[in-house]
Amino acid sequence: MDQIAKCIKEGTHTLFPFYDNLPDVNLFLGNSPLPSLEYGANYFLQLSRVNDLNRLPTDLLSLFTHEIMVQENDLEKVYDILNIHSVKSYGKTIKADAVVIDLSAKNKLFKKDRELIKSNNYLTENNLYISDYKMLTFEVFRPLFEMSSEKYCIIKLPTLFGRCVIDTTRVYCSLFKSVRLFKCANDSWLKDSAIIVASNACKKNIDYFMSHIRSVTKSLNWKESNNVQFSILKDSVDKEFIDKFLNFSTKVYESLYYVHSLLYSSMTSESKSIENEYQKKLTKLLL
């Protein structure tokens, strides 16, 4: 419990090694690899609790999260730390300190209003912006289409689960000589979003990678039609890299499981009131 509280209050981060050799890139647009235990068993435990929350009515979810949904200003915190004064998301001719893509649903918890679903057996979709690997689209590589002389490439990831996010991180570890992954205290600890900060570009690897990407997309420039699910590598990355990524993401998912368990207990408490012991623990932990 102390470690979870520390993780939430202080955030967590990791630095990945640089790999001079790109893995075997094989872009396919339209579908993402399916979840598997190889890429994080903790996710499946986490998903059971997410499904419990997912079936509750969204008006109740809004009521119980209204006070604990902090403003997600983790990107701004990163800008301050790195002394970044100007950012851009598009426009190769525009000059900035960093090119930034935010794939998260900022300050949002669910996708649409919904009534109670009587059991998990009737769940047909994930209505929450939590643990949804389908939210990661090929736009995660859009910065490479937009970069010119920017020092940093920054990506707000919508999730930490699945093969695709690990493969993507591994590719970035060959495109940039410094790749760090952050889950900031200023981010929402109801969601599994995180930030990649990449710097010190490796030009030869970027040129090779973009040559392959453009041959598949048949375009020199970014196209909105490419903003779809994707797979990027032919084979799984090495176990050592997967383990290093999971060492980071497991800390996040263990914290989220505890937070979501408190939230679920609060929403289903016998008191039928937002003033209950679980909600008080949540408020103390997140605010």
UniProtKB/Swiss-Prot annotation:
GO terms for molecular function: mRNA 5'-cap (guanine-N7-)-methyltransferase activity. It is an enzyme of class 2 (transferase). It holds the Pfam family Pox_mRNA-cap. GO terms for cellular component: virion component. Catalyzes the last reaction in the mRNA cap formation pathway. Heterodimer of a large and a small subunit. This is mRNA-capping enzyme small subunit. It comes from Yaba monkey tumor virus (strain VR587). The lineage of its organism: Viruses, Varidnaviria, Bamfordvirae, Nucleocytoviricota, Pokkesviricetes.
